[in-house]
Amino acid sequence: MSIKRHALTLAAATLLAAGLSGCVGAIVGGAAVGGASAIDRRSTGAQADDEVMELRIRNTANTYLRQNNAAEGFEPKLAVVSYNRHILLLGQVATEGEKNFVEQVARAEQSAQAVYNYIEVAPQARTFGNVSADTWSTTKVRTTLLGIQGVIPSRVKIVTYEGTTYVMGILTPEEQAAVTEKVSTTAGVQKVVTLYQTYIQQP
């Protein structure tokens, strides 16, 4: 079975399962989907698409990778974050082919508007120390966002992976500058990747 055909088959099965089990609430980057609609700049449709795409891409890719593991004894690790239909891919896989496959799965989503593939080709497991450091770094960054006047922290998604902090959100240029400055000067942050979408305020 070809990779493309396999991906489509798995995606259909995942969607069917999701439909049978109902919607599952998720918390990504510290903001509950559906719980902050009053201040969320995403439409309700985009919020729903984000949740469904994260689940479907992760399940489809993980199922294929585990069935076609290129490195014996190595379990691929994937994280999928979708914000306003912009998809961020993180994790570790064994080969470039596997990395490209995950990206193909993400780009096959009809609602996806952009895909950022930061998956690493590194067939070795992350250590507990790596995970703890990333978690602590994300927590510190989220805390610093509370001190930015005029910026609502729940409009900013923060994800740290292997020492790199990824920042997403629908923000004005002024908000983007303030958030970037705050994140990049937070103690312990090694590298910052900004994936903003620009919000234009109506006159």
Q: Which residues are covered by each model-predicted region?
A:
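Short, intrinsically disordered, charge-biased short linear motifs at domain edges
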Residues: 9
